């Protein structure tokens, strides 16, 4: 009932926005659509199709041959789980969630391993972090190495802290795909699955772009609140606002942007939930893990700033913990 009430309220708010401010609403919708068409569609659709095909044809083991032993030693993952680890760190939101859910549906990993993977493998892509966030928006390309270390080190540390010494079974030994099962029906099914999921992402991106624009119209006179609220809602707009904020220095904007990109936004959480349908994986546990990871990232970023500028780090820490 609570979820239904939230969805109904948001729907009514967006409908009112469309009716009362059609120009601004249409502009926000257009921005979301263009971001989907120019970025998500060409980047994620081929990966959705090919990763689904690899799972269906049991081709994961060849890709993770060298990573699997390390992933098992440090995180207790199965070989199929190490594939999710690899793709979730390389390919961006919400690929980690989709691969986890696909592997659970195909009985390639246990639901327990899927839930564990979901807590740390759904991350921003290196291309988004280094290209858009650090180079285009913040204009801090010199911070690329330390940013990569913080943003990807935090979820790995979170995973290590929450593992509880558990080792997950390798279900790929029990389930193999024979050559007689390989046909164009499998390819067709993978293509349709990819198209369905990429269309869902487009819809969510449009809706959350409209919400972000509405929030900007309502609280635009409060720059720091705008950065935090919009960033927690949708990371692309949040990072753009943070980078352009007149009250934040470059260093403070960098730390806040890492917090935003590590959390992934409620838009990313909604996209993640859409990927989890048909499984028992919980989006609430995912949100708790992302909040913990974002706080770890922010603390490490502030610590890094504190090593060179303590007077700046202390007020920034107070703002983030308020």
Predicted regions and their residues:
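Selected transmembrane alpha-helices and immediately adjacent juxtamembrane segments
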Residues: 9-24, 29-41, 45-49, 53, ...
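Transmembrane helix-loop junctions in multi-pass membrane proteins
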Residues: 19-30, 56-60, 131-132, 211-222, ...
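Transmembrane helical segments that form the transport core of multi-pass membrane transport proteins
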Residues: 187, 191-261
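Juxtamembrane inter-helical linkers in multi-pass membrane proteins
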Residues: 69-81, 170-186, 230-236
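Transmembrane alpha-helical segments of multi-pass membrane transport proteins and ion-pumping complexes
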Residues: 39-48, 52-61, 89, 93-97, ...
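Alpha-helical membrane segments and immediately flanking helix-loop junctions
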Residues: 74-138, 229-247, 252-279, 288
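N-terminal membrane topogenic signal
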Residues: 1-9
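Juxtamembrane and boundary regions of transmembrane helices in multi-pass small-molecule transporters
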Residues: 2-3, 105, 135-138, 142-178, ...
């Amino acid at each position: 009932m609570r979820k239904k009430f939230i969805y109904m309220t948001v729907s009514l708010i967006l409908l009112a926005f469309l009716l009362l401010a059609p120009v601004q609403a249409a502009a926000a919708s257009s921005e979301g659509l263009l971001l989907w068409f120019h970025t998500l569609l060409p980047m994620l659709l081929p990966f959705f199709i090919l990763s689904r095909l690899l799972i269906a044809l049991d081709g994961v083991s060849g890709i993770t041959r060298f990573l699997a032993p390390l992933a098992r030693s440090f995180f207790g993952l199965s070989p199929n789980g190490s594939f999710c680890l690899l793709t979730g760190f390389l390919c961006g939101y919400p690929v980690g969630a989709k691969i986890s859910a696909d592997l659970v549906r195909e009985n390639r990993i246990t639901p327990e391993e899927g839930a564990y993977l979901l807590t740390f493998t759904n991350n921003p892509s290196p291309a988004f972090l280094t290209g858009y966030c650090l180079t285009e928006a913040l204009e801090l390309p010199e911070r690329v190495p330390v940013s990569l270390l913080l943003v990807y080190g935090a979820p790995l540390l979170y995973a290590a802290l929450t593992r509880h010494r558990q080792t997950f079974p390798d279900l790929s030994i029990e389930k193999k795909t024979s050559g007689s099962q390989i046909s164009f029906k499998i390819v067709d099914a993978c293509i349709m699955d990819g198209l369905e999921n990429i269309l869902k992402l487009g819809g969510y991106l449009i809706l959350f772009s409209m919400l972000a624009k509405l929030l900007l119209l309502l609280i635009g006179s409060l720059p720091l609140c705008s950065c935090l609220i919009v960033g927690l809602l949708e990371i692309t707009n949040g990072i753009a606002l943070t980078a352009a904020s007149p009250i934040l220095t470059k260093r403070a904007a960098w730390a806040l942007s890492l917090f935003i990109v590590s959390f992934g936004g409620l838009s990313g959480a909604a996209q993640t939930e859409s990927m989890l349908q048909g499984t028992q994986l919980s989006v609430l546990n995912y949100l708790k893990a992302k909040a913990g990871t974002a706080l770890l990232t922010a603390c490490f970023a502030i610590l890094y700033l504190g090593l060179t500028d303590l007077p700046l780090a202390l007020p920034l820490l107070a703002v983030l913990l308020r």
